[in-house]
Amino acid sequence: MEKRTILAVVLSIGVFYLFSFFYGPEKKPAPAAVSVPVKTENVGAAPAVSVQAAAIAPVVVPKIVSAADVTVETERYTAVFSGVGASLKSLTLKGFRETNKPGAAQVKLLANADPALPSFSTRGVGFALSAQAAYSPNVSSLKLLSGEKKQLVFTYVDAQGFVVRKTYTFDGTGYGIALETQLVNNSAAPIAGAFQYLFTSPFDPPQKDGRYETYGSSLYADGSLHTDAPKNVASATKKYDKGITWAAINDKYFLSALLSVNNSIASVELKKSAAGYLESDISTPAFSVAPGQAVTVAHKLFIGPKEIDILKAQGSSLEQSLDLGWFSAIAKPMLYSLKFFYRYVGNYGIAIIIITVILKIFFFPLTHKSYKSMKEMGKLQPKMAALKEKYKNDKDAMNRAVMELYRDHKVNPLGGCLPMIVQIPVFFALYKALMYSIELRHAPFMFWITDLSDKDPFYVTPVIMGVTMFIQQKMTPSNMDEMQQKIMLGLPVIFTFMFLSFPSGLVLYWLINNILTIGQQAYINKLVKD
């Protein structure tokens, strides 16, 4: 093995460490404001204080205490809405638990918002609608069976002569929730402004664990994913106002998003609130409502898992929230392959092993070429050493002589490295797919590995992986000097410590890959044997 091979391996380790912190370049938001028409309805020639026209149903304030909580239950979740701001206080996912221990609590999203500004609270921009306005719901609770659709309508009647209705439409089967916000102008003067929906969440991650390593705000704007950790807005507000498709608060596995419907998001402003929360203010396009008219703005909510098929079904490019990095074009097929094999074997660990075997077979020609090149280079070592001794005082002459030696023996000096480099994007893509796949969350493999998204609790697989790396090195023919040998002997130790805290699913991939490589190397050594 040559010095350049050692350098390639060492650089790969460095890139591997840094890669998990890279999420692709972020576009700078354009400063231009967005002006998009919204749906305006003519109430008719009724008196300014009335909403009796046929196009708008009469305002009937339900006989329920204002600001009361309303519970909505479907087969997927239990949501608690508040009359304060007609907001969503929390949503508990029935199919997901905080840990994989028996009796663990179900995952509850949005519950850590600022109590004064629950998620999806709505305020007026340009007119006096408070985010703490007390709305009256049309029902005290809702329960939906699979396939059913039902509505929750919150109504707020303002003393200044306008009415705001927020209508949530639920699907008993999915995670998506339709939202329509309507302003009815019963006053004698036009009302100009916009609606603004508020997301608030703790500025610091609720917990210091792997789930929150990508915690923060994200949005899809102008065809690009933009992610902002809380620290990005700790000292200054950040605003996006061009081509926004959706805006969200997310962590590694779950997403709470507001989706645009017919360009209904004009801008998103991120900041640290006065109360110390991460705040996302999502504004609609500006509107003007004449007396006797109404305006309705539509959005869609998604609060659920970052599972690629579920996200894709929502539309609006929501699947882009699953950020698989620079090599997502490779990582997404890897993820789909993982899901495909799982359907047949029922175990994600086995699915990882199958993918590893397929990749090893696919890259066999490149690996064969790499090892063959290294073997041929090894044969030239004595002649190269002689040339170095002969031209030790003339580096230019030595380099020319070495290149001539390569040409005479038809050896490519990069032949051992290039096949390795070609495989690096595939490894990083699979790394991303395994690291950020919710499918592996709490997925058992066998024996003591009960969660492929968590580290091996007894560190057995990382240690075995280190041993297989050592065996690999011993099987690789080399003409290294003493210093190079020490460097190479240190690599299994470095990798072992690196992988102690890595998800066991990723360690499993690397371990199986090493075992297959040992067998492959033994076979190739036999093929290229003198």
Swiss-Prot record:
Transmembrane segments: 5-25, 344-364, 411-431, 487-507
Cross-referenced InterPro entries: Membr_insert_YidC, Membr_insert_YidC_N, YidC/ALB3/OXA1/COX18, YidC/Oxa/ALB_C, YidC_ALB_C, YidC_periplasmic_sf
CDD domains membership: 5TM_YidC_Alb3, EcYidC-like_peri
Keywords: Cell inner membrane, Cell membrane, Chaperone, Membrane, Protein transport, Transmembrane, Transmembrane helix, Transport
UniProt GO MF annotations: membrane insertase activity
Domain of life according to the entry: Bacteria
CC per GO annotation: plasma membrane
Protein topology in the membrane: Multi-pass membrane protein
Chaperone among keywords: yes
Keyword Transmembrane helix belongs to the record: yes
Compartments it resides in: Cell inner membrane
Gene Ontology biological process terms in this record: protein insertion into membrane; protein transport
Entry's family note: Belongs to the OXA1/ALB3/YidC family. Type 1 subfamily.
Subunit structure and binding partners: Interacts with the Sec translocase complex via SecD. Specifically interacts with transmembrane segments of nascent integral membrane proteins during membrane integration.
Function, as annotated: Required for the insertion and/or proper folding and/or complex formation of integral membrane proteins into the membrane. Involved in integration of membrane proteins that insert both dependently and independently of the Sec translocase complex, as well as at least some lipoproteins. Aids folding of multispanning membrane proteins.
Protein name as catalogued: Membrane protein insertase YidC
The gene coding this protein: yidC
